[in-house]
């Protein structure tokens, strides 16, 4: 278990990504996947209002029913205004079958305009702070994967409890969140949530690294929890196995791995880092 920054929450080092958990065609498969994660001791569950047009939240809500107090539940909102974000929050609570969220994050900030909209009068931050006072959410976070400078700008404007970003074996070579944001987040006591840990599977399909190399490298960075998309019970089993057998990767091994991955840097594999204009 690791501590999620200033929240003080103790979380499993591996977290289930909500988007991929809802990929299986049959709902029963998604529920079985979540139940298996629970059996193995996973306590952190990621989601977003927009994932699979709401199906991801609905399936996770069914799977976690009766187990809510044993886990840390996070979801995200894309709307930047107060009114729209309030409707989204209410919808997420209904789908997830809960009356509160442990963490609610502003989803996918890509530009300073996004940040300005969230903080503007009538912006989504107003909804988040009101919901926190009323007990509908416990902590406020922010996510994004396009530009580390936007993450830094958000951190400097508000004491976010959590911040979610791409951290993987390619990230240090190009528009790096690990080098630019992660340490600053830790200095500000924000819980760091790693995502895109396999670059949406492209680290595997491009043969950049194996899962057994890629995930331990991420856990060796200053992260509280690694979120990875799993679409089968077998993938859950293997990822949790890696989490439970993890030992910090020596610096020389990290350097060797990064030297090997460097030729793959850029947006061909990390395509989510393309600028908003491209």
Residue ranges and their predicted role:
Residues 1-71:
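N-terminal binding-site loop/beta-alpha segment at the start of enzyme catalytic domains
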Residues 4, 16, 45, 60, ...:
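Conserved, mostly hydrophobic/aromatic
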Residues 5-11, 38-39, 61-69, 90-99, ...:
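Acidic (Asp/Glu)-rich catalytic clusters
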Residues 17-28, 74-84, 115-117, 203-209:
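Active-site mouth loops of central-metabolism enzymes
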Residues 19-21, 48-50, 76-80, 106-109, ...:
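Active-site beta-loop-alpha junctions enriched in small/polar residues
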Residues 28, 36-38, 43, 179-278:
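Structured C-terminal cap/extension of enzyme domains
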Residues 43-51, 74-76, 138-142, 164-165, ...:
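Short catalytic-loop micro-motif centered on adjacent basic/acidic residues
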Residues 80-169, 173-177, 186-193, 234:
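Glycine/proline-rich, positively charged
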């Amino acid at each position: 278990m690791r501590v999620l920054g200033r929240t003080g929450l103790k979380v499993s080092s591996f977290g289930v990504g909500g988007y991929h958990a809802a990929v299986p065609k049959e709902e029963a498969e998604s529920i079985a996947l979540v139940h298996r994660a629970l059996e193995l001791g996973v306590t952190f569950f990621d989601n977003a209002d927009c994932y699979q047009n709401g199906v991801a939240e609905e399936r996770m809500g069914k799977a976690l029913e009766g187990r809510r107090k044993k886990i840390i539940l996070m979801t995200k909102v894309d709307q930047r205004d107060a009114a729209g974000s309030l409707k989204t929050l209410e919808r997420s609570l209904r789908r997830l079958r809960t009356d509160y969220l442990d963490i609610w994050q502003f989803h996918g900030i890509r530009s300073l305009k996004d940040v300005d909209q969230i903080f503007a009068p009538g912006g989504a931050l107003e909804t988040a702070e009101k919901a926190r006072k009323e007990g509908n959410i416990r902590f406020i976070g922010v996510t994004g994967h396009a530009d580390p400078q936007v993450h830094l700008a958000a951190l400097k404007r508000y004491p976010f409890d959590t911040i979610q970003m791409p951290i993987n074996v390619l990230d240090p070579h190009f528009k790096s969140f690990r080098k630019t944001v992660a340490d600053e987040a830790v200095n500000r006591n924000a819980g760091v949530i790693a995502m895109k840990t396999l670059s949406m599977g492209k680290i595997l399909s491009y043969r950049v690294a194996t899962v057994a190399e890629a995930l331990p490298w991420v856990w060796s960075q200053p992260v509280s929890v690694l979120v990875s998309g799993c679409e089968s019970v077998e993938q859950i089993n293997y990822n949790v196995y890696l989490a439970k057998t993890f030992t910090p990767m020596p610096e020389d091994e990290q350097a060797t791995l990064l030297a090997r991955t460097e030729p793959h840097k850029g947006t061909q594999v990390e395509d989510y880092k393309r600028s908003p204009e491209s």
